[in-house]
Amino acid sequence: MNIKNEINSIIQNLNKKEFTKAITTCEKLIKKKIKHTVIFNLYGLAYQKQGMFLESIKAFEKSIELQNDNYLAINNLAVSFKSINENKLAEKFYQECLRLKPDHVIAIINYANLKEKINKFEDAIKLYFKALKFKKEVNEVYIFLKLSDLYLSIGNFEKAKDFAQRVVKINPDYVAGHVQLSKFINYKDDSKHLLQMEKLIQKKTPQNNEIMDLSFSLGAAYEAKKNYEKAFTFFNQGNNLRRKEIRYDLNDHIKLQTSIIKIFEDVKELNIIKEPFKSKIIFICGMPRSGTTLIEQIISSHKEVLATGENNFLSTYIKENYLDNFLLLQKKIMRDIYSKNYFFQDFVSRSLSEHNFESQVFTDKSVQNFLWIGFIKLFFPNSKIIVTDRNPRDICLSIFKINFKNGFMNFAYSQKDIAKFYKLYFDLINYWKKLYPKEIYTVKYENLIYDRVAETKKLINFCDLKWDPNCLRHDKNKSVIKTASVSQARKPIYKSSLNLSDNYSKYLKEMFSLLKN
C-alpha cells in the first residue's frame, strides 16, 4: 500500500467536498493499524467540514499525539474548539500553533477571528495587521474589510471608512466594499458614491445576491436624500430577493409562542424561586429595532456595568435542552425547575467566561430575549428585565430596511410577516407583563428622546444602580457594538427617526393596515 497515494486520494475527496468518502478511506487505513499524523489530521478535517466538531477534535488530538509539532493539526484543533465555544482552549492551541510556526498566516487570521468573537477587538486588529505583512499569502481585500468592520464596532469611524475606501480602490466592482463604504457617507451632500452603486447594480445579473445587498444600501442612500419613493423601491427589491432565498413559515413561531404560554400557565402556580445567580444580568427585551442597542449603551456607560450585546446564551441553552420542533419539553423543564441542579446557570456563567466577560453586572440584549422572560424569572431571579417600546410603525419600517444576517430574523422580508410577527410579540409581552407586573420595566423610546435625563435616571434606578453621569454620555461609551444599530448608537440621541414611517405610508399600506388591526 502506498500511503502517499492514499493521502492524495483523501485530499482530493476533501477538495471535492466528498467528506463521507474521505472519512471512509481514513477509517479503512486506521483499521489497518496505520498510524500517520497526516491521515488523522485529514480525518479530523472531514468531520470538521460536516460540523461534527467533537469527532474532529478526537482525530486532531490523535494526529498531535503522533507528532506533537504538527502545527497544521494544532490550528485545526483550535478551529474546532472555537466552533463549540471552547474559546479558552481554542486560544491555547492558536498560541501553540503560532509558537511552532509564527508565519502561519491562516492561523494568524483564525486567531484574529477568535479575538473578535471574544470581544478583544484591539487584539484582533493587531493580528490582522500582522497577517498583512505576508502580502503574497493573504487576501488584502478580506482583511481590509475585516478591519473596517472592527473599527466600526469600536466607534472609530474615520479608520473604518479609510479601510472601506481601500477595498473599493483595490476592487471597484466588489459589492461588499461599497456596502461597507455606504455606512460612512452623508448622501444628503454627496451623490458621487450613490451613482457608483447604481452603475454597479446595473452590471449584476438578477440572480446575483449582490443586487440584494446593493438594494438595501441604495435604499438607505435615497432615504438620506429624502427621496422616499426611490428608497422604498430599492428596499422592496432587496426584501423580495432575500425572501426568495430563505424558507420561513410564521406558523413555526406561532407554535413556539403558544407552547411558551402553555408551559408558563402551568408554572406560574408553582411559586418556585431558584437561588440568585452569582452576577446580576440586566436583560433588555424588545422587538429588533425598538431601541435595545441604545438602552444597552446607556446602561453599560455605568462604571459598574459590562455590555455583552447579543450573546444568545439563553437561546442556545433553551434550544439545546428544552426545545424540539418548536415545542417546549415540559417534563424536562419541570424536572430542572424542581431539581437542585444549576446546569442552566452554570452554562451561562461559563459562556460569559469563555467570551471574556468579567463583571458583577452585565447587560444582555439578545434578540430573542422577549421569548424567554419566564425562564429568566425562574432561573435568574436576581436579574432585571427591561422592555423597550416604540411606535410600532417605526419599528416595522426599520426592520423592513435592514438585510439581517440572523436566521431568527427571517420574518423581516415581507410586509405581512413583519406586521404579524409584531402582533405576536405584542401579545407575548403583554402576557409577561400580566404574569410579572412589578418586575418588568418598560422604556418608551419616544419618552427617552424627549426627556433624556429624567428617563435615564428612572432606568438606572430600576437597575438598582447608583447614579452615574456617564449614562448621559452613551455616545462616548467604548463598548463593542456588533448590531445593525452601531452607527446610531455611537451618536447623541437624535429625533430624526421619530415618525419616519409617515414618509412611507403610501408604500407600506399592507404592513401598516395590519398593524392598525
Predicted regions and their residues:
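Short coil turns that delineate tetratricopeptide repeat
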Residues: 34, 68, 102, 136-138, ...
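Register position in tetratricopeptide repeats
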Residues: 15, 49, 83-84, 117-118, ...
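Phosphate-binding active sites in nucleotide-utilizing proteins
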Residues: 274-380
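Conserved alpha-helical positions within TPR/SEL1-like repeat arrays
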Residues: 11, 38-49, 72-83, 106-116, ...
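PAPS-dependent sulfotransferases, especially Golgi type II membrane carbohydrate sulfotransferases
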Residues: 163, 182, 194-206, 214-282, ...
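Conserved phosphate-donor/acceptor-positioning beta-strand/loop module used by diverse small-molecule
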Residues: 376-399
